[in-house]
Amino acid sequence: MEQPAPLDGTEWQEITKGNWFCGVYRYRFDFEAIIQLNENGRYEWATRLVTEASGEPDCEDSGDYATLPRAEKKVRAIFDELMALPSLRGKTAY
């Protein structure tokens, strides 16, 4: 799956170096959990960074960026919702 481009063209490898969630602090990303079936027939979940371009300067000035705990909590909540769907119930995810 192709990642969306960051707002200023910075490479994803640089943004996520050492910590997948570090982009939260710099770009005010929201996180989305994705369920997919891998080649071993197991369901796995991954996070996808989704840019939130609207209001970027205002948020920077006010210091109202997403925090790491909030991002992780959102990913977990979306993951739990997806795994509760009838089509995924009883599947193994990691």
Where are these regions (language model features)?
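Mixed-charge, Lys/Arg-enriched low-complexity segments
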Residues: 2-6, 46-94
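Short N-terminal "domain-start" leader segments
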Residues: 1-46
